[in-house]
UniProtKB/Swiss-Prot annotation:
This is tRNA modification GTPase MnmE. Its main location: cytoplasm. The keyword Zinc-finger does not apply. It comes from Methylorubrum populi (strain ATCC BAA-705 / NCIMB 13946 / BJ001). The lineage of its organism: Bacteria, Pseudomonadati, Pseudomonadota, Alphaproteobacteria, Hyphomicrobiales. One of its GO terms (biological process) is tRNA methylation. HAMAP family: GTPase_MnmE. InterPro entries: G_TrmE (IPR031168), GTP-bd (IPR006073), GTP-bd_TrmE_N (IPR018948), GTPase_MnmE (IPR004520), MnmE_dom2 (IPR027368), MnmE_helical (IPR025867), P-loop_NTPase (IPR027417), Small_GTP-bd (IPR005225). PANTHER family: TRNA MODIFICATION GTPASE GTPBP3, TRNA MODIFICATION GTPASE GTPBP3, MITOCHONDRIAL. The keyword Nucleotide-binding applies. (6S)-5-formyl-5,6,7,8-tetrahydrofolate binds at R28, E86, R126, K444.
């Protein structure tokens, strides 16, 4: 049994297109054996970066597998930074399976795991970690605003800004360490150096804090604007959820307490991701299971971006307090004879559709105000946490009192630079790489 090759010496291959039947199937190969794989299957390597029509043959039997377009992409100017090859096959399942089996028999080649190509691009410096996250977000994007935000990340919007901040931090650190080295020189104006260092640290801190002061728009856009439907039992929450989402997502019944657990439905409202959440009716109950549902309802309300407080048109609002989050009062069942609209809120009928367009417009307006148009720099909690730490260290430098030990100033600057490096994946991120790339598609 031979020893396993180091990761950088292995060659990986995988379909880069969907797994179903299609007109064309694309197979990618990356690594030092990509060229030899073409030699064995395609009879040689075509001119670099030009598609060439070739007969693909099984290297073991010589049998023809397919007539395909092949491309030879020598590194390092490739997506992964390595030698690469692409095989554009006919999209039949049997054709693709036969070619993948043949590639598996090429020495040094093995099937790729999820995210393996993007991981190699990151490890070889073709993309930074924020751009890799942009790829993941683009794959997961369900709405136009999510697509726009993901493309900004993939284009390096955050990565370039953080790299510039990190470069400034490195310059400050170099100045602080130089001041330490020449501290014994009598002609050094230590007070002037300290003031200049504090001023530049404050400016860098303020720039980072400005990016953080965005109301968490980036994270909320990735996760979806959360709208919780809350109210007493039989207020029409499940019926309204089904009407707003256009499908029977929740069970509707006249029996109070039918909904016990939260039901989520993801929607696209004007290109914005919205998550509608049906919840258990709010009331005092001796039923242990229903009481747990009510407890979970209160938890969802506290974490919501918007609460739709549903009250039947002929009912009372009740004593519920939703002061912690934005609330929109909705008068339901306006089609009933007794449904004279009460004061305040939007009157809707999930049965006739009356008022639903106005309600959707109101939800979309709230989502647009909260999420923006995909222009946020910070899109993940990981970014926010690292940038907050960097700003904290810079704040200590900027506000250090006279006589503060210069060694501690330098250490704070060093920690700020390290925190900024974590955002782009330059330091301290090994433990989260597996989680990130495991969420990618095979062949990405």
């Amino acid at each position: 049994m031979t020893d396993a090759l180091p990761v950088r010496e292995e060659t990986i291959f995988a379909p880069a297109s969907g797994f179903g039947r299609a007109a064309v199937a694309v197979v990618r190969v990356s690594g030092p054996a990509a060229g030899p794989a073409l030699d064995q299957l395609a009879g040689g390597r075509p001119e670099p970066r030009r598609l060439s029509l070739r007969r693909l043959r099984d290297p073991g039997t010589g049998n023809i597998l397919d007539q395909a377009l092949v491309a030879w992409l020598p590194g390092p100017a490739t997506a992964t930074g390595e030698d690469m090859a692409e095989l554009h096959l006919h999209g039949g399942l049997a054709v693709r399976a036969a070619v993948l089996r043949a590639l598996g028999r090429v020495p040094g080649c093995r099937p790729a795991e999820a995210g393996a190509f993007s991981r190699r691009a990151f490890l070889n410096g073709r993309i930074d970690l924020t751009e890799a996250e942009g790829i993941a977000d683009l794959i997961d994007a369900e709405t136009e605003a999510q697509r726009v935000q993901a493309l900004r990340q993939l284009d390096g919007a955050l990565g370039r800004q953080v790299a510039a901040w990190r470069e400034t931090g490195i310059e400050l650190l170099a100045g602080a360490e130089a001041a330490l080295d020449f501290a014994d020189e009598g002609d050094v104006d230590e007070d002037g150096l300290d003031a200049a260092l504090a001023g530049r640290a404050a400016a860098l801190r303020d720039a980072i804090r400005a990016a953080l002061a965005d109301g968490r728009r980036g994270e909320r856009l990735r996760e979806g604007f959360c709208v919780v439907l809350a109210g007493a039992p039989n207020a029409g929450k499940s019926t309204l959820l089904n009407a707003l989402s256009g499908r029977d997502a929740a069970i509707v019944s006249d029996i109070p307490g039918t909904t016990r657990d939260a039901i989520e439905v993801r929607c696209d409202l004007g290109g914005l991701p919205v998550v509608l959440v049906d919840t258990a009716g709010l009331r005092e109950t001796a039923d242990v299971i229903e009481a747990e549902g009510v407890r979970r309802t209160h938890h969802r309300i506290r974490s919501a971006d918007l609460v739709l407080h549903l009250v039947p048109a002929d009912g009372e609002a009740g004593p519920e307090d939703f002061a912690e989050v934005p609330v929109l009062r909705v008068r339901t069942k306006s089609d009933l004879p007794s449904g004279a609209p009460g004061e305040g809120g939007l009157a809707v009928s999930a049965v006739t559709g009356a008022g639903l367009d106005a309600l959707l417009d109101a939800i979309q307006g709230s989502a647009a105000s909260a999420l923006g148009g995909g222009d946020a720099l910070v899109t993940r909690e990981r970014h926010r946490e690292a940038l907050s730490r960097a700003a904290g260290h810079l704040d200590r430098v900027a506000t250090a009192p006279a006589g503060f030990p210069p060694e501690l100033v330098a250490e704070d600057l060093r920690l700020a630079v390290r925190a900024l490096g974590e955002v782009g994946g330059h330091v301290g991120v090994e433990e989260m790489l597996d989680r990130l790339f495991a969420g990618f598609c095979i062949g990405k």
